[in-house]
From Swiss-Prot:
InterPro entries: Cyt_P450, Cyt_P450_CS, Cyt_P450_E_grp-I, Cyt_P450_sf, Insect_CytP450_Detox. It is an enzyme of class 1 (oxidoreductase). GO terms for biological process: thermosensory behavior. Its EC number is 1.14.-.-. Transmembrane segments: none annotated. Heme binds at residue 444. It is a peripheral membrane protein. This is Probable cytochrome P450 6a17. May be involved in the metabolism of insect hormones and in the breakdown of synthetic insecticides. One of its GO terms (cellular component) is endoplasmic reticulum membrane. Belongs to the cytochrome P450 family. It comes from Drosophila melanogaster (Fruit fly). It holds the Pfam family p450. The gene is Cyp6a17.
């Protein structure tokens, strides 16, 4: 009887604590939805709706309220969903010192692959960002450009082998372009000729896909990792599957050993990491990287470059197939620039393809691969206006998908219109309203590389092939709701016709 009474008391205290925590926004008078006692405001994810769609709808519901954000709970985690452009700029840029960290899970001791530049916090992030920034200069991109072009040529050969000039062929294009991006990253990050364009079952790609789509514990514990990152770290939980950790550790160690032994230089991402590793080994930790730090950055370079660029290329081809006038205009630009540069793809030539860049930017507006940004308040944010107060430890969500589809910012947002990204149109819009790579000091460090490999790949494909919708093309597009990243459900099937060169 005493035990039963004790259980009742404990459960009552837990219910009281949960209700009190979930009542935070109501006590402050901040607009918010009704909170589920267990799931907070996230009960429809990951089974019914994509998390970015939940934040998008929240943005539209509360964007005209008197407050610059709306209250939200990710289970029991206090979250502020930004609805005001001025607050957005303060979070990402002006008051970045209050919002430096993302508040996501990483465990550098037990799960070294998780301790990436994207995830780590505080002084460690600042030091690592400073060390890695020179790796992504325009000069470094130019050095890696020939590698990207070489893989682009191989992709062209694969597409030609799969299409017939007289009638065309329906292809699932995301898988094919994913093999292109995997071979680019394999070359630039690991110095490997992965050969995945010719071997769809190549281990480098199959393990890579599993590293992105599979996590160690399944959906429920994944949610726990993201909802309670600090507690998960104390419990020594891991995010990445053991096969991925073992595979990439082996690949990176073998690559380092080979290049140090042979003194081979490839002017790629791995060369830069190895130079920093050598600094660490010689006692210069200020400019150096440990093996685990190098491993994590090589891994995130693969994951980010492989998934985001291939997904963006797939969505771009989908929109070009549905908008033949845009495709024709893009093909004309590519042909003109290609001819001007002696019928070669050059670094300078790709930079001249302004309409191609606009097509990619418009694709990323409609389909931002990471469609919401997170920051965490490291200290109380107490500006002059008390409405802007955000308490320490609050997760701040920037609903990029909502902003990208806001008709006050992008009129007729459902229409695919690359001209939105002319210099004049960009200047006429508020800043921080195009967010596929984030913004401010913690934006995506690999932006230039991602744009480069995406533009090169699309230039090869649009120059050589016509893409059209087919009966197998899914219209409207459906996205996979359980993933954090935006991706097409069941792939993207398009009719591909070979063009005369």
């Amino acid at each position: 009887m005493l035990l039963l009474a004790l259980i009742v008391v404990i459960l009552s205290l837990l219910v009281f604590a949960a209700r009190r925590r979930h009542g935070y926004w109501q006590r402050r008078g901040i607009p918010h939805d009704e909170v589920h006692p267990l799931f907070g405001n996230i009960k429809d994810w990951p089974n019914k709706r994509h998390i970015a769609e939940i934040f998008r709808d929240y943005y539209f519901k509360y964007k005209n309220s008197d407050y610059p954000f709306a209250g939200f709970f990710f289970f029991f985690t206090r979250t502020a969903v930004v609805t005001d452009m001025e607050l957005l700029k303060r979070v990402l840029i002006k008051d970045f010192n209050h919002f430096e960290n993302r508040g996501v899970f990483y465990n550098e001791i037990d799960d070294p692959l998780s301790a990436t530049l994207f995830s780590i916090e505080g002084q460690k992030w600042r030091h690592l960002r400073h060390k890695l920034t020179p790796t992504f200069t325009s000069g470094k991109m130019k050095n890696m450009f020939p590698i990207v072009v070489k893989v682009g040529e191989e992709m062209d050969k694969v597409f030609r082998s799969k299409t017939a000039a007289d009638r065309g062929q329906v292809l699932e294009v995301v898988d094919l372009v994913a093999r292109y991006t995997a071979d680019v990253i394999g070359n630039c990050a690991f110095g490997l000729n992965c050969n995945s364009l010719y071997d769809p079952k190549a281990e480098f790609v199959s393990i890579g896909k599993r590293a992105i789509t599979e996590h160690r514990y399944g959906n429920m514990l994944d949610i726990f990792l993201f909802g309670f990152p600090k507690l998960s770290r104390r419990l020594r939980l891991k995010l990445n599957i053991q096969e991925a950790e073992d595979f990439y550790t082996k690949i990176v160690r073998e690559t380092i050993d080979y290049r140090l032994r042979t003194k081979e230089k490839r002017n790629d991402f791995m060369d830069s990491l190895i130079e920093m590793y050598k600094n660490e080994q010689s006692g210069n930790s200020e400019d150096g990287l440990t093996f685990n730090e190098l491993l994590a950055q090589a891994f995130i370079f693969f994951v980010a470059g492989f998934e985001t660029s291939s997904t963006t290329m797939g969505f771009a081809l989908y929109e070009l197939a549905r908008n033949q006038d845009v495709q024709d205009k893009l093909r004309e630009e590519i042909g003109n620039v290609f001819g001007k540069h002696n019928k070669e793809f050059t670094y300078e030539g790709i930079k001249e393809m302004k309409y191609l860049e606009q097509v990619v930017m418009e694709t990323l507006r409609k389909y931002p691969v990471l469609a919401h940004l997170t920051r965490m308040t490291d200290t109380d944010f107490s500006p002059e206006d008390p409405k802007y107060f955000i308490a320490k430890g609050t997760i701040v969500v920037i609903p990029a998908l909502g902003i990208h589809y806001d008709p006050d910012i992008y009129p007729e947002p459902e229409i695919f219109k690359p001209e939105r990204f002319t210099d004049e149109e960009i200047a006429a819009r508020p800043s921080c309203t195009w967010l596929p790579f984030g913004e401010g000091p913690r934006n995506c460090i690999g932006l230039r590389f991602g744009m480069m490999q995406t533009c090169v790949g699309l230039a090869y494909l649009i120059r050589g092939y016509k893409f059209s919708v087919s009966p197998e093309t899914q219209i409207p597009m459906k996205i996979v709701v359980k993933n954090i990243l935006i991706s097409a459900e069941n792939g993207i099937h398009l009719k591909v016709e070979k063009l005369a060169k």
